[in-house]
Design a protein with these regions (language model features):
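Substrate-binding pocket helix/loop in short-chain dehydrogenase/reductase
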Residues: 98-99, 106-111, 206, 210
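Active-site helix of classical SDR
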Residues: 122, 157, 165
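Short C-terminal tail/terminal secondary-structure segment
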Residues: 212, 218, 229-230, 241-253
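Alpha-helical segment proximal to the catalytic Tyr-Lys
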Residues: 127, 170-174, 238
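The beta1-alpha1 cofactor-binding region of Rossmann-like NAD(H)/NADP(H)-dependent oxidoreductases
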Residues: 40-41, 61-72, 104, 223-224
């Protein structure tokens, strides 16, 4: 791509939480950002925050588990902002339950959004990266990839993201495309609030209990994850690929 051309990123699940923080950070880093979530209207706050700071952004609605919607979303970003060469696969859902209570539908939905969604988004976006001979793919995993009670579906999906990432690094490296996975620990989001509700704890007590188990003595914020992704999405991270980086405030074992 021309030296002075603005890089374009797509961040999925970017209406709120980690995705919104990542979209804003990449925009602050100078990228135009496709802000993608299930409903384009839900992305308005993120887009407005980026534009108010002088950045360029586009709200895009798509179900990442549906191939036709994914292709249309990537095409829209390429048309309106330019060919995407940075992709952050962050979209995710929870359907927590103990294994014997978990329905096949809950299993399929979680793996569909996390794994199928990352596969479809990457397949659509990598074409632009190959053409540019440059790309950055960052897949959101989780500390739950190591196993977590009540999250058989989510843990399997997040572990799968790590294997998917390493394979992408091997297949796409020849095109100067890197692929890395970021695995957050406890981050204050709607998802962790939902987990607190599932175990019948107030979110404040849940955070306090978690902080006692974390080496740095606090829970994480979405911006902690965004800082890490900012580096992995940068030109300076061209020799970092196929890695899983835990953003968890300390070792997990």
């Amino acid at each position: 791509m021309p030296e002075n051309q603005q890089r374009v990123a797509i961040v999925t699940g970017a209406a709120r939480g980690i995705g919104a923080a990542v979209a804003k950070r990449l925009a602050a880093d100078g990228m135009a950002v496709g802000v993608l979530d299930l409903d384009a209207d839900s992305c308005k706050d993120t887009v407005q925050a980026i534009e108010s700071a002088g950045g360029r952004a586009l709200a895009v609605g798509a179900d990442v588990s549906q191939e036709d919607q994914v292709q249309a979303a990537v095409d829209a970003v390429a048309t309106e902002l330019g060919p995407p060469t940075v992709l952050v696969n962050n979209a995710g859902i929870l359907r927590d339950n103990l294994l014997f209570k978990m329905s096949a539908e809950d299993w399929d939905q979680v793996l569909g959004v996390h794994l199928r969604g990352a596969f479809l988004m990457t397949k659509a976006a990598q074409k632009h990266m190959v053409d540019a001979n440059y790309g950055r793919i960052i897949n959101l995993s989780s500390s739950s990839a190591l196993g977590n009670r009540g999250q058989a579906n989510y843990s399997a999906a997040k572990a799968g993201m790590q294997g998917f990432t390493k394979t992408l690094a091997k297949e796409l490296g020849r095109y100067s495309i890197t692929a890395n996975s970021v695995a957050p620990g406890f981050i204050v989001t709607d998802m962790t609030a939902a987990t607190a509700a599932r175990v019948k704890m107030s979110f404040e007590d849940f955070q306090a209990a978690a902080a006692k188990q974390i080496a740095v003595g606090r829970v994480g914020q979405p911006e902690d994850v965004a800082h890490t992704i900012s580096y992995l999405a940068s030109d300076g991270a061209g020799y970092v690929s196929g890695q899983v980086i835990y953003v968890a405030g300390g070792p997990l074992n």
